[in-house]
Amino acid sequence: YTENVDGINVHIYGAHIFHTSEKRVWDYVNQFAEFNRYTNSPVALYKGELYNMPFNMNTFNKLWGVTTPAEALAKIEEEKKEAGITEPKNLEEQAISLVGKTIYEKLVKGYTEKQWGKKATELPSFIIKRLPVRFIYDNNYFNDLYQGIPMGGYTKMVENMLEGTEVKLNCDYFDNKEEFDSIADKIIFTGPIDKYYDYCYGELEYRSLRFETETYPVDNYQGNAVVNYTEYEIPYTRIIEHKHFEFGKTLGKEAEGIAATKTIVTREYPDSWNKEKEPYYTVNNERNSELYKKYKELADKEGKVLFCGRLGQYCYYDMDKVILSALNTADEVL
């Protein structure tokens, strides 16, 4: 969801960069918007030093002064050998076993602990199955074939998707359940699956986010769309400067003079979750996975209701994956 503020498209719920390798998904979204060529190349700030993300040869050169892939690989393998971890018992040990101590302590530890609200030694190892390490000089965060930002913003793209469709807002499904059920052959429910069943087995857990957005009287605040802050002592995980998603360009001639002298930035803070907050990330530990299985068994018995999306299926979805899931579901139902 984006809002146009003085010609700058502001990502209200944090940075969203569209990326996919699915041609079907790319062709689908391009029916509703033209995409720019934005490439996500975040940087990480740790104790006043900037490092390129994801971990690549530019990162390794900054960390150790190495210039060749062989030197970088040798350095990482040396640190992994020194750690001597064969069976990681927690996230910290898992990360060190994958990339060594230097990368972990500077670029993984603090960020991850802020993200989850727990010490890395208290987090299960399975949270990090792998850490992408590239032995090339390439700062493109994603490996996908297609990438970009919809020109005019995501809100405009969704408006185009919904053209000709009746949409009712601010309607609570549970307050109007009988009415909605009576007029539809199928119900697509994208809310929390545990709420649908009145939390009969207990509540699923989530992590939330909160955002602080400010306007500065400068045309360029940080020189990049996304800067990660990996020190634990800094409470936010990243700062987003929205105009860089569209290369500093403004929307409409009337906005050019305004946006040239101002910029809008958002600080992103990980947050605990309760029912009054937005659920952003599922917490897929053993307890929640078992709980979801119970709700899924109930959902599988439904003849009319389909549970979709992050909340309905209790899983993390990138934008392209949830669109592909929706298209596949439509193929099955229609």
For each of these PLM feature ranges, what is it?
Residues 44-51, 58-186, 190, 195-197:
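Active-site/ligand-binding neighborhood in enzyme catalytic cores
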Residues 38-40, 170-172, 242, 308:
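Conserved beta-strand termini and adjacent loop/short-helix elements that scaffold enzyme active sites
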Residues 9, 34, 166-168, 304:
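Conserved beta-strand segments of alpha/beta enzyme cores
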Residues 12-16, 147-148, 211-214:
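A short acidic, glycine-rich active-site loop
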